[in-house]
Every structure is written in structure tokens, then in C-alpha cells.
Curated annotation (Swiss-Prot):
Homotetramer. It holds the Pfam family G6PD_N. Residues 171-276 are annotated as: Linker. In the N-terminal section; belongs to the glucosamine/galactosamine-6-phosphate isomerase family. 6-phosphogluconolactonase subfamily. NADP(+) 2 binds at residues 742, 755, 785-787. The active site is at 640 (proton acceptor). Its EC number is 3.1.1.31, 1.1.1.49. GO terms for molecular function: 6-phosphogluconolactonase activity; glucose-6-phosphate dehydrogenase activity; NADP binding. It catalyses: 6-phospho-D-glucono-1,5-lactone + H2O = 6-phospho-D-gluconate + H(+); D-glucose 6-phosphate + NADP(+) = 6-phospho-D-glucono-1,5-lactone + NADPH + H(+). NADP(+) 1 binds at residues 345-352, 379, 548. Residues 689-711 are annotated as: Disordered. The gene is GluPho. Bifunctional enzyme which catalyzes the first two steps of the oxidative pentose-phosphate pathway, which represents a route for the dissimilation of carbohydrates besides glycolysis. The main function of this enzyme is to provide reducing power (NADPH) and pentose phosphates for fatty acid and nucleic acid synthesis. This is Bifunctional glucose-6-phosphate 1-dehydrogenase/6-phosphogluconolactonase.
Length: 910
């Protein structure tokens, strides 16, 4: 490339919302255009700067290296190299000759440009202690600014956590902890910050030029970086983004910052918001309201040079141009948003016992938008009051955890929630039914939008009244004549937006929908097809929540998945495994990756085996029609237990965002071979001979019975209600470590636990030495404890003790979010980490389908075990090959936290 070709391509630079975008075709094109762009910026600034000096900040990383190499080769832009002043934007705290040193990786640039480093380069002296290094470099940068008055050019990139330079989110917290706390580097008294490390205003108190920061994501933890304010004041800020991943990050940053920007988390947005200057102003005097002309009112000094996508700026423009872009992309609460939650199968037990109570608690906690509709769709013919009377008993149970609230407040909340609920009778397979549903749906959504519209106009006249602010007044209808007239009196053309009463005026109101399919999977496709054909949302997004089971083997899953994805894309699908919504389960990742002792020991060198147990005292009486076609393996092993395994064995992800966690889970699943029949024992419970009944128990499924007592189960059914199997993970970390799955119905206790058993000390001759064990109990209580050996007091014998690591009274929470409460909120926010991806399900079925087929083809009969026992006796021999039972282990911590406010049973999906 030569200068003339670059100038032609530069004519295609687009400006969108204070950012210039220069697109390139490939990496070679990127490296040349970026080099020419930087050289052109240097040349232009030498022409206008006093004495021709240009101050340039260089950031590290791999991306700019090839760009800098090309800069050395450019001859057709004449630059006075003797007047170039460079400084290192960020540096790793390593010696200058270290392979990770930013200076070491770019020093060729100074050599090729004949830069006198003593006179023309400012860099940190990493031979000093970190404190002295920071203070010394801070003084150097201060001298540089005093001498040259400003920074002309800052060349930057962006990391996977949105960091720029070495300013790692949360910026204020990172800088404060590493620099000011206990006066480590700078005087803490100079800060008078707001007591909220997320607040943008805190950044203005960071007035030094150079800071010490730390990161756990990269090889070199200790970093030296110039301040965000110094970079923001650069006359030209150039971002080099040379891959799809980096461009996705940039777009994601813009999306997340659309409503309410957080500079502490997205520092590049701070540079954008300070990028509009009066330099080279080219004011467009016409009154065209076109978006591009709007943004040309000032000179933008932030430039993104991109590579990886064609028409990247078009995709960026869509964020701003779409009427509904705000809600389509943003995870933040939108004050202009109506959220409609549609529950298909609302008359079933899942909806009554789980979904509606979870929504009610979110409503009570103000976690959902004030503008909210909840519409139940079912085949059962009944009026709304009859339907609501069936769910209100479960809603009232939720209020038990709000002990401090008055009875009147609780009544108001129930009434307010009821006024947001609706009921529609329809048929899932009838297109006509969905046509009628669409008319009903759009009518009530428009009514809610009008409420918001009138309330908005009311505010324009100086009133702060909002029709949805008071729960007790939520029964107000827009058809209320007096209230409507009052609104129209306030909404005069004088006080409302231009053309507000015009027939083509479109009120900027977003309607987002969450569709919960609390249905059997064979109804999924017809429901989604009819909804897409007749009811598709044109004013916002549709998010689809699906309940298990997702097929009954690999082939049926592939077919179901194909049909679902023909109607809605993967980004819209939220597949629920309710175990991922449990509070302790969601804490497994942080438990592992924030505790050094656990992270360093979680591999085959230290771990003897992992045992995951999920036992229930309930049988399946009353639910046999659902359970019998699936059995225990499909019910809990292929989903819940496998998900728990991925969370405790996955590698440390790059970060904890949705995609990174999903990728690491998939790596584990891909490493698990199919389960062998010889490593499996199945069982089926029968009526016990000496079972002691609980006189207070009214639950038929907990009373002594045989599996075949359920009237919906064939007397010859061989469906297993119990299974123990051995899995392996063929990865470097876990090769050869047996994973024991054990689960069943009608057993001796209710528990879900993970036991990580360690190898014994090599060479130990003490046969009584029990293995150390790290135990995590997920339900019916939450507990963590460690089994270890100590010497008995007064003798030489060893004994086993338990170190209680359970949450203490100080952190005790009476109101722990229930799984569905968490999952519904995560879906609303657009977070997918706690949901199962299509690829995860594919691998899950791949692991279990061969075993399921072999059991069916060979008609393997399950071993019998008594109701209320621990399962088939033969299981002990299989497990003992891999797991050291040791002494009876019945210890429980003194304080444990209930894992769920509700009973945890999902088998009866209607």
C-alpha cells in the first residue's frame, strides 16, 4: 500500500456517535492502514503544534507490533523523527529484557526511527521497587506534560474484560486498593470519594498520572499504567481492534453502555465521551435530522481501526438507529420498557408452585420493571378469578419470609401482582387460537403503553405523578373517564413533543416479552410455530424459556433442537436446568476459582475420586405417567448431575461472562466418553416390609409403596428409579479419576451433595487412615466442610474430624433466592451463564444415549431395593472399588442455610 491508496480508503471513514471507524479487509490491510493512519496523524500534528513536537503514547500487547513494524517502512509521509516524544502507556512489572516486557517487544520501533531514548522516550524503571517505580514514573510523566503541555496521540487496544492499557475493571477499586489503601503509594487522605466504587464520579478524585494495578487474568499480575484522565486528554485516541472477538467486545461495550454508562467497568467509553473537541470543527448548517449529520457538530478524536467484519459500522449504526435498540441489546433496566411474561401451561403444577411464586417474589423485591404484564395461557376453561385463587395459596407462602412487613403492605402487594396478571384460554396446536391471542395480547399491551404515555406527558407539565408508582392504584384502567380526561388536559400540544397527536407519531416505548413454555416437549414446536406465525413481537424482543426434558436420547434431542431453532435463534433460547439457579450451585465457580488451596488441588495428582449423590425420599406415586417413559437417568443424571460435574471440574475461564463459562463446560463434556453398562447398576424400589410411617405425612409419594402401585405405571415396567454409574474425564487434569454418580427415588434421605475425596498420603502404613474429603451439600441444606485427620489428645492415635466451612450466622440470609426466582431474573437481564446451551445438551445426550439404548435393547431388569433404604446392596461393592467409605459420616454443621424456600420437585410438568 502507498499513501495515495490510503487516502482513498480514508475517505470511507464513518463517524458514528463521536467515534471514527476505519474498516479494513484483512490483517495485512489492517496493519498497513493502521500504520499509515498513525503516521498521517503524526504528520498533521507536527504541522500545527508549536515547535513541531508530537507526544505519542504506546500501549502493549501483540496487536500493535506488526503495525509498528509497518510504520518503520513508510517513506512517503515525511515526519521529523527528532521531534517525536514517546511514552509507554502501560508496562508489566518485569525487567526491560523480559519476554513479557512491553518495552522489550516494541524497542525495535525506537531503533528503526533513530529515537534517542534518553531524550525522546519516557518509560518506567522496573529495576526499582514497585512503589519507587510508580512514584518515579509519575514524576517523569508530570515533567513530560509540563514540558510539552499535552498528549497528542494514544494508541490503545481492548482486553477481554474491557480493560484498556492496564486499567482493569473495576478501575477505581483496583487503583484504590493498590495505591491509596494504607497510603501504600499515594496519600489516602487526598481521596474524598463517594462510598460506592461503581460510581463514575469517583474517577475525578484519581489525579495522579501513573498507577499500580493488578490482574489475575494474565501471566504478569503486577502492572504500571498511566491514568484514565491522561488518556482521555489525548488529542487523538486510536483503538486497534484486529479480530472479530475484539470487535464483538467493542459492540458489546456500546450496548451495555447505551442506557447508563459505567466508566469503571468500560473505560473506553470515558475516552469516547471526552472525544468531542472544537478542533477542526466542521459544522453542518442544514437542519437535516439525519443521524450522521447530528454527530458531525464537532470533531471526534477517537478512532477505531477494525478488522474481522464487513460493514462493521452498519452493525454499530443499528444499535442507535433502531427504535427498539435500547431494549434489544441492553442488560440494564429500561425505564421506557413494558415487560410481558407469557406462561404457556399456566394451569400446571410447575407454573402454580414455581413460576408464579418466583415472579411474585421478584415483584415484591422490585427486581422487575414497574410496567409489567403476566399472561397465563392454558387449555383449561376457567375465569381469571378461579385461576388466581388456585395460585394465591403459593403466593401467600412467599410472604412468610417478609416478617417485618405489615399485613396491609402484603395485601397491597398481592393486589398489585393480581392486577398485573391475566388469563387466556387457548389451544397450543390451533393457529386460530393464536390469532385471537395476538389480538388480546396487543390490545392489553397497547393499553399499558398508553398508561405510560399519558403519565409521561403528565410529567412534562411539572407533575411527578406516575400511574404505576402506587401498587394500591394498579387497578386504575386507562378507560377510567375522569383519569383519562385529566391526562388529556395535561397533554396539550404546548406541553407535549412535536407532532405528538399526529397519526404517524410513534411513542418510543419498547415492549419485551419472555415466553415460558411450562409444557411437555412434544408441545414445544407447535406452540413456537403458532406464536411465531401469529404473535411475533415487532416492538422488542422475544425470549424463550424451555423446561426439560429436551428429548429422551441423542436423536430425539437433535430433532427437537432443529425444530426449535427453525423458529427462534439460539440467542433467544433459555433452556432451564433449575439446579443452575440454586444459590449454592451458582457459587461453585467462585468457590473453586477464588480459593487457592482448592484450585491448586483440583486435579488427578491429588484427587482420588469425585462422588455426586442426589437422593430423594419421595417415590413417584402420583407422577408415574411422567416418570415412567424417562426414568432416573434421564430425569436427573443427564442434566442436573452432569451440570454439577462440569462446574467443579472445568478449567479457569478467561472471565466469568456467559460465553467463556459455556466454552469451558463444553470442553469438559467433550472429554467424557460414553458410559459403559459394566460400570452401571440400576434399581427399582419395592414396598418395604418394616417401614415406619410418619403419622403427620400426607404426601402419598413419601408413604411406603412399590413403584408399580402407581395406576399409570405398567406392572411389567422395568424403568429404573435408581442408578449408580462411573464416568471418566479424559483430560490432562482429570485422566483416570473416577466420577461416581448415584441417584434414586424412595431412598433413606433427601440430599444432594458433592464429595471430593483426596488420595491418601503416599507410603502411609496406617490402615485406619481415612481419606481427606471436601464435601459440598447443596440440599436440603447448604453446607461445606472438610474431613481431615488429627492426632487424638493424650495418645498417638489418629482420629477423623470435620472442619466446618459453612456460612456463619453473620452471613445468614433468611430469604435465599429460590432457583426459579434467580433464573427468571437472569433471563430478564439477558444473562445466559445459568442456562444450558444447545451444544452442552448435545454432549450430555452423547454421553448417556449408548447406555440407555443398551439397557433398552437388552431389557436389563433393575435390581430391587426396599422403599426407604439406601438402594440396592450391590451398589456398595461397585462404589467401594473407587471410594473409601471410612467411618459413618453423619456430621452436620450447627448452622445450615435452607437451600430453597419451596419444596424442590419438578416432576409434574403439565
Amino acid at each position: 500500500m502507498d499513501y495515495e491508496n490510503f487516502v482513498k480508503s480514508a475517505e470511507e471513514i464513518n463517524n458514528l456517535h463521536n467515534v471514527n471507524y476505519l474498516e479494513t479487509k484483512d490483517l495485512n490491510d489492517f496493519n498497513w492502514k493502521a500504520a499509515y493512519y498513525i503516521c498521517k496523524e503524526i504528520y498533521d500534528k507536527q504541522q500545527i503544534n508549536k515547535d513541531g513536537y508530537v507526544v505519542i503514547g504506546l500501549s502493549g500487547g501483540r496487536t500493535p507490533i506488526d503495525v509498528y513494524k509497518n510504520m518503520c517502512l513508510i517513506k512517503d509521509i515525511k515526519i521529523d523523527k527528532s521531534k517525536l516524544i514517546f511514552f509507554i502507556i502501560d508496562e508489566r512489572y518485569k525487567s526491560d529484557d523480559h519476554k513479557f516486557s512491553n518495552y522489550n517487544n516494541i524497542k525495535f520501533l525506537f531503533h528503526n526511527l533513530n529515537i534517542n531514548e534518553k531524550e525522546q522516550l519516557y518509560k518506567p524503571d522496573t529495576t526499582k521497587s514497585i512503589v519507587d517505580c510508580i512514584l518515579d514514573y509519575n514524576d517523569k510523566i508530570k515533567i513530560m506534560i509540563e514540558k510539552y503541555k499535552k498528549v497528542d496521540i494514544a494508541i490503545l487496544g481492548m482486553g477481554s474484560d474491557f480493560h484498556i492499557a492496564s486499567l482493569f475493571p473495576n478501575i477505581f477499586y483496583n487503583i484504590y486498593m493498590n495505591n491509596y489503601q494504607n497510603n501504600y503509594i499515594y496519600n489516602e487522605k487526598t481521596l474524598d470519594f463517594i462510598n460506592n466504587d461503581q460510581d463514575n464520579d469517583n474517577l475525578k478524585y484519581l489525579k495522579e498520572y501513573v498507577y499500580f494495578t493488578t490482574t489475575n487474568q494474565f501471566d504478569v499480575r503486577k502492572r504500571i499504567t498511566v491514568s484514565l484522565n491522561l488518556l482521555a486528554n489525548a488529542s487523538s485516541k486510536i483503538f486497534l481492534l484486529n479480530s472479530k472477538d475484539k470487535l464483538d467486545l467493542w459492540k458489546n461495550m456500546l450496548i451495555k453502555s447505551y442506557i447508563e454508562v459505567n466508566y469503571n467497568l468500560y473505560p473506553a467509553t470515558y475516552l469516547i465521551d471526552t472525544s468531542c473537541t472544537n478542533e477542526n470543527v466542521n459544522i453542518n448548517n442544514n437542519n437535516n435530522n439525519n443521524n450522521k449529520n447530528k454527530n458531525n457538530y464537532c470533531y471526534s478524536n477517537t478512532t477505531v481501526i477494525s478488522c474481522g467484519y464487513e460493514n462493521y459500522t452498519k452493525s454499530i449504526e443499528e444499535i442507535y438507529d433502531s427504535k427498539y435498540a435500547l431494549s434489544l441489546y441492553s442488560n440494564s433496566l429500561n425505564k421506557e420498557e413494558l415487560l410481558t411474561i407469557i406462561i404457556f401451561g399456566c394451569s400446571g403444577d410447575l407454573a402454580k408452585k414455581k413460576i408464579y411464586p418466583a415472579l411474585f417474589k421478584l415483584f415484591c423485591n422490585n427486581s422487575l420493571p414497574k410496567d409489567l404484564l403476566i399472561i397465563g395461557f392454558a387449555r383449561t376453561v376457567q375465569d381469571f378469578d378461579t385461576f388466581f385463587d388456585k395460585i394465591v395459596i403459593y403466593l401467600k407462602r412467599c410472604l412468610l419470609c417478609y416478617e417485618d412487613w405489615s399485613i396491609s403492605k402484603k395485601k397491597d402487594l398481592l393486589n398489585g401482582f393480581k392486577n398485573r396478571c391475566r388469563y387466556f384460554v387457548g389451544n397450543y396446536s390451533s393457529s386460530e387460537s393464536f390469532e385471537n391471542f395476538n389480538k388480546y395480547l396487543t390490545t392489553i399491551e397497547e393499553e399499558e403503553a398508553k398508561k405510560k404515555y399519558y403519565a409521561t406527558c403528565y410529567k412534562m407539565n411539572g407533575s411527578d405523578y406516575n400511574i404505576s408508582n402506587n401498587v394500591a392504584e394498579d387497578n386504575i384502567s386507562i378507560d377510567d373517564e375522569n383519569k383519562t380526561n385529566e391526562y388529556f388536559q395535561m397533554c396539550t400540544p404546548k406541553n407535549c413533543p412535536d407532532n405528538v397527536f399526529s397519526s404517524n407519531y410513534n411513542f418510543p416505548y419498547v415492549i419485551n416479552r419472555m415466553l415460558y413454555l411450562a409444557l411437555p416437549p412434544h408441545i414445544f414446536v407447535s406452540t413456537l410455530k403458532n406464536y411465531k406465525k401469529n404473535c411475533l413481537n415487532s416492538k422488542g424482543t422475544d425470549k424463550i424459556l424451555l423446561e426439560k426434558p429436551f428429548g429422551n436420547d441423542l436423536d430425539s434431542f437433535k430433532m427437537l433442537s432443529k425444530q426449535i431453532l427453525e423458529n427462534f435463534n439460539e440467542q433467544q433460547i433459555y433452556r432451564i436446568d433449575h439446579y443452575l439457579g440454586k444459590d449454592m450451585v451458582s457459587g461453585l465457580l467462585k468457590l473453586k476459582f477464588t480459593n487457592t488451596f482448592l484450585l491448586s488441588l483440583m486435579n488427578r495428582h491429588f484427587i482420588k475420586c469425585i462422588k455426586i449423590t442426589l437422593k430423594e425420599t419421595k417415590g413417584v406415586y402420583g407422577r408415574g405417567q411422567y416418570f415412567d417413559p424417562y426414568g432416573i437417568i434421564r430425569d436427573v443424571m443427564q442434566n442436573h448431575m452432569l451440570q454439577l460435574l462440569t462446574l467443579i471440574t472445568m478449567e479457569d475461564p478467561i472471565d466469568l461472562n456467559d460465553e467463556s463459562v459455556k466454552n469451558e463446560k463444553i470442553k469438559i463434556l467433550k472429554s467424557i466418553p460414553s458410559i459403559k453398562l459394566e460400570d452401571t447398576i440400576i434399581g427399582q424400589y419395592e414396598k418395604a416390609e418394616n417401614f415406619k410411617e410418619d403419622e403427620n405425612n400426607d404426601d402419598e409419594s413419601k408413604k411406603n409403596h412399590s413403584y408399580h402401585d402407581d395406576p399409570h405405571i405398567d406392572k411389567n415396567s422395568i424403568t429404573p428409579t435408581f442408578c449408580t454409574c462411573i464416568l471418566y474425564i479424559n483430560s490432562i487434569n482429570w485422566y483416570g479419576v473416577p466420577i461416581i454418580f448415584k441417584s434414586g427415588k424412595g431412598l433413606n434421605k433427601d440430599i444432594c451433595e458433592i464429595r471430593i475425596q483426596f488420595h491418601n498420603i503416599m507410603g502411609s502404613s496406617d490402615e485406619n487412615m481415612n481419606n481427606n474429603e471436601f464435601v459440598i451439600i447443596l440440599q436440603p441444606v447448604e453446607a461445606i466442610y472438610l474431613k481431615m485427620m488429627i492426632k487424638k489428645t493424650g495418645c498417638e492415635e489418629m482420629e477423623e474430624v470435620q472442619l466446618n466451612l459453612t456460612v456463619n450466622e453473620k452471613n445468614k440470609k433468611i430469604n435465599v433466592p429460590e432457583a426459579y426466582e434467580t433464573l427468571l431474573l437472569e433471563c430478564f437481564k439477558g444473562h445466559k451463564k445459568k442456562f444450558i446451551s444447545d451444544e452442552e445438551l448435545y454432549e450430555s445426550w452423547r454421553i448417556f444415549t449408548p447406555l440407555l439404548k443398551e439397557l433398552q435393547e437388552k431389557q436389563v431388569k433393575p435390581l430391587k431395593y426396599s422403599f426407604g433404604s439406601s438402594g440396592p446392596k450391590e451398589v456398595f461393592g461397585l462404589v467401594k472399588k473407587y471410594y473409601n467409605y471410612g467411618k459413618n459420616y453423619t456430621h452436620r454443621p450447627e448452622f445450615v442455610r435452607k437451600s430453597s424456600f419451596y419444596e424442590d420437585d419438578l416432576l409434574d410438568i403439565n
